[in-house]
């Protein structure tokens, strides 16, 4: 008989994970996040980082962080609505609003908490959320917390989206369409022009999670709205400071009244200590770098195009990727994990992704090249992919 006191029921659940082959241990990174990293004691080419632009170890960001610690200390000491709102926080939000070409921005502790906080503050019981079936887990959790009804539409299927919009047209006070800007497992881009047209036709709010588009799509990485020239037509944009920006945190960009409302009702914002000064200063410096030049985003896309084309020429299935996120579709879960393990033996770290993160029989090794990778890095990785792919009869 299990006892709550000694957590036997948790032990049983862990055993179930092990039997199903989905139990995992944390990978240990023993160096800064970069194109070549030390992982579990082995120096490898890193193809699994979200550090798209190589900014996580950039000297200008490190200098800004150190100077901020000297000036502001290591922590804000309070939530921003009490006494944790430093001038540096306000400066970051002004910079982000200018960069995103939006009226205002509010920062959160992560992109995950931004989604959870914004969704539940904007919609409520009596409203409806229309959500893409492949949206991120933070969107799913935010929808659950909102108390609004949730209707799922087929992934990037505009006919299905319109079908849902017709069904809910006169039944709800507020209708909100939510989509990722770039989908993290397949690397495809949301059909935002069509989504925006449908939202305008059926009087719905548009909400875009730009976590994997910020710093990647648009002029100097301004995101999906800029990529599609949709400024002023997307109501709510979520961004992250932890991927291309290279630091930590999240934010929401939009109309000033939206930000004012979130100041009063965004629960993760209201009840979490403000971002530490070092992270804020480093994020400001990252935005400065992107605003000065598009060199990093151009290098990122050059590398992504090169790597993707070479993988395809070797015979790998890269799915429907349109971005630096390039999955190598394997199919079988065990083979995908073995592929990842053998790549590591060859000096390449590329994470195997299996069910339930992706559908059954759609297991893959997901790769992300960065602006910091050299052509030599990519060629060495491709050589390993070819060798292991042939060993496992994948190509």
From Swiss-Prot:
GO terms for biological process: biotin biosynthetic process. The keyword Transmembrane does not apply. It catalyses: 6-carboxyhexanoyl-[ACP] + L-alanine + H(+) = (8S)-8-amino-7-oxononanoate + holo-[ACP] + CO2. Substrate binds at residues 136, 357. Its EC number is 2.3.1.47. The keyword NADP does not apply. InterPro entries: Aminotrans_II_pyridoxalP_BS, Aminotransferase_I/II_large, AON_synthase_class-II, AONS_Archaea/Firmicutes, AONS_Archaea/Proteobacteria, PyrdxlP-dep_Trfase, PyrdxlP-dep_Trfase_major, PyrdxlP-dep_Trfase_small. Keywords: Acyltransferase, Biotin biosynthesis, Pyridoxal phosphate, Transferase. Coiled coil: none annotated. Its cofactor is pyridoxal 5'-phosphate. Pyridoxal 5'-phosphate binds at residues 111-112, 184, 212, 240. The modification N6-(pyridoxal phosphate)lysine is found at residue 243. Pathway: Cofactor biosynthesis; biotin biosynthesis. Transmembrane segments: none annotated. It comes from the Bacteria. One of its GO terms (molecular function) is 8-amino-7-oxononanoate synthase activity. Belongs to the class-II pyridoxal-phosphate-dependent aminotransferase family. BioF subfamily. Homodimer. Catalyzes the decarboxylative condensation of pimeloyl-[acyl-carrier protein] and L-alanine to produce 8-amino-7-oxononanoate (AON), [acyl-carrier protein], and carbon dioxide. NCBIfam families: bioF, gly_Cac_T_rel, PRK06939.1. This is 8-amino-7-oxononanoate synthase. It comes from Thermoanaerobacter sp. (strain X514). The gene is bioF.
